[in-house]
């Protein structure tokens, strides 16, 4: 059939024939040209067009490499039969327990615990985890078990008891007491004197020692003077022991009567500001009453040095500071 004329050429119009490769229809003349071309394109693998790379050209956007698909992990075989059997055993055990409770008989033993074989057991705590959790847990549990074992070795002794913390005890101060004065466990408690007694109506600070050479003033010696006076006191006690008991009693009675007279006279003649105060059994003058005396640098009770010149009390034993 003759068709229309285009550019002076005559196009023949006939039956359309389909292509064997792509299935499209062509004229017989066009089909001869299309056949080899279509065969090449079919055999050649066509590349996938990446539109994102074309869009990123000429811009600052970096080209992203396509991610490779991860291989799927192999599927583990399902243990549905074992799970089904465990489920049936659990239901039977529950029914048996209910029946035993109703009848009042002996309770049946509990079913054995079921474990997932896919889980990994920790060798330290005997718990089970999946593969990902087991890798993290086993390392942590290993360090913790080693830390606890080392801590137990140091904290327990051979008997298994925890070691007690050592307590700090300061070294006791050595005091040289005269032989006539008995030593006491606590220096802060008042100690009754063996050679002097307190008179009713007279302040306790008025009491003075029999061995005092002054008579009307309390005996206040520093630690260095005490050490020197100790041998003399020991010699006096030896001399006293050589006298008969009857003479010793008479002499003590005479000394007590003379001491009472001197104490009453001194108490009446002394002004109000110059009195002695008794603090914890120790005779000491008030600092406020008479500030003209000499302040010792060491405590008369425990021998501790005063940290400052204006201290009124000892920082170690708490005894009031004396005035010499």
Swiss-Prot record:
Biased composition (Polar residues): 188-198, 206-223
Region Disordered, residue ranges: 43-83, 149-225
Disulfide bonds: none
Biased composition (Low complexity): 176-187
Zinc fingers, C2HC/C3H-type class: 15-44, 118-147
GO MF annotation: an example: zinc ion binding
Family: Belongs to the ZC2HC1 family.
Name assigned to this protein: Zinc finger C2HC domain-containing protein 1A
Taxonomic source organism: Mus musculus (Mouse)
């Amino acid at each position: 059939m003759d068709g229309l004329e285009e550019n002076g050429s005559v196009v023949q119009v006939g039956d359309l024939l389909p292509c064997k490769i792509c299935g499209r229809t062509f004229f017989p003349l066009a089909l001869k040209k299309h056949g080899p071309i279509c065969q090449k394109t079919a055999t050649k693998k066509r590349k996938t067009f990446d539109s994102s790379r074309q869009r990123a050209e000429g811009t600052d956007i970096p080209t992203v490499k396509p991610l490779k698909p991860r291989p799927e992990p192999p599927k583990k075989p399902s243990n549905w039969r074992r799970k089904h059997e465990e489920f049936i055993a659990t239901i039977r055990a529950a029914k048996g327990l209910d029946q035993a409770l109703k009848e009042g008989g002996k309770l049946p033993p509990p079913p054995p615990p079921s474990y997932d074989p896919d889980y990994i057991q920790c060798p330290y705590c005997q718990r089970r985890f999946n593969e990902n959790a087991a890798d993290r847990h086993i390392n942590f549990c290993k360090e913790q078990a080693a830390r606890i074992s080392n801590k137990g070795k140091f904290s327990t002794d051979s008997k298994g008891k925890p070691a007690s913390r050592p307590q700090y005890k300061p070294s006791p101060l050595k005091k040289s007491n005269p032989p006539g004065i008995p030593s006491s466990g606590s220096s802060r408690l008042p100690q009754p004197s063996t050679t002097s007694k307190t008179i009713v109506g007279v302040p306790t600070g008025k009491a003075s020692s029999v061995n005092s050479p002054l008579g009307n003033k309390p005996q206040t010696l520093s630690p260095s003077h005490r050490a020197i006076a100790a041998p003399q006191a020991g010699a006096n006690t030896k001399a006293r022991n050589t006298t008969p008991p009857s003479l010793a009693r008479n002499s003590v009675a005479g000394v007590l009567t003379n001491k009472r007279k001197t104490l009453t006279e001194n108490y009446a003649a002394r002004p109000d500001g110059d009195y002695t105060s008794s603090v914890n059994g120790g005779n000491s003058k008030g600092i406020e009453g008479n500030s003209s005396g000499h302040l010792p640098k060491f405590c008369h009770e425990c021998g501790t040095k005063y940290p400052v010149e204006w201290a009124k009390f000892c920082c170690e034993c708490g005894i009031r500071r004396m005035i010499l």
